[in-house]
A protein has these predicted regions:
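Short, well-ordered beta-strand segments in beta-rich or mixed alpha/beta enzyme
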Residues: 1, 30-59, 97-107, 136-166
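An amphipathic, aromatic/His-enriched active-site/gating alpha helix that lines ligand/cofactor pockets
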Residues: 16-30, 48-81, 128-135, 154-180
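Short, surface-exposed ligand-recognition loops at beta-strand->loop->(often short) alpha-helix junctions
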Residues: 1-10, 107-116
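Glycine-rich beta-strand-turn "strand-cap" elements at beta-sheet edges
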Residues: 32-41, 66-101, 105, 136-147, ...
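Short amphipathic alpha-helical/adjacent loop interface patches that line ligand
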Residues: 14, 18, 120, 124
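A mid-sequence, solvent-exposed acidic-amphipathic segment
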Residues: 112, 120-122, 130
Length: 180
């Protein structure tokens, strides 16, 4: 978590690290920082690397070292969760004050993993294809707890997110997976 009254510092150091890493490190494919809207002391970093070697390279690069030097004053606890990618889809993203980020965590019963995957992934493809306001959709399963799915989504605005929730493909996904 973020130390009390340090959420602005977290946002600053995250922005600096993300810009430098994505712009200058081959193999660092995407990085995003987000804080809970109902608890700004809880933050998440979403990082996507080409492979393990690119991740190791990032850990030894100047942007991460600068982040690591400042982090103890800003962050009082952290937990790393490694995900197995299930779906990675995005458009050209230029965040602004209207852009929203959602992190959704879903537990799927073990016996429904394959069926769930076969329903949710086409829904994500369709969302990116037909919805202008859907900017990115990433899905991964927890390496240690494979029944736990993480979805990181970026929408152009709150309105676009609400429109997404009313599409037939999203409603169909909800209907088909409710029991899973």
């Amino acid at each position: 978590g973020i130390r009390p009254d340090r959420d602005n510092d977290f946002a600053d150091v995250a922005r600096q690290t993300i810009s430098a890493s994505v712009d200058h490190e081959a193999g660092t494919l995407a990085m995003y920082a987000l804080q809970r809207s109902d608890n700004s002391g809880q933050a998440f970093m979403f990082e996507l690397y080409e492979n393990e070697r690119a991740y190791r390279k990032h850990l030894n690069a100047a942007p991460y070292k600068a982040f690591a030097a400042r982090a103890p004053d800003i962050i009082d606890s952290k937990k790393k969760i490694t995900l197995e990618p299930q779906f990675l889809g995005d458009k050209h993203i230029i965040p602004n004050e209207r852009t929203i980020n959602n992190l959704v965590i879903v537990e799927v019963k073990p016996e429904f993993q394959s069926e769930f995957r076969n329903i949710v992934l086409p829904e994500m493809v369709e969302s990116l294809k037909v919805e202008k306001g859907v900017l990115a959709m990433y899905a991964g399963t927890d390496s240690e707890t494979p029944k736990r799915w993480y979805f990181y989504e970026i929408y152009a605005s709150e309105e676009d997110y609400q429109l997404h929730r009313q599409t037939l493909h999203f409603l169909d996904y909800l209907r088909q997976t409710a029991h899973m």
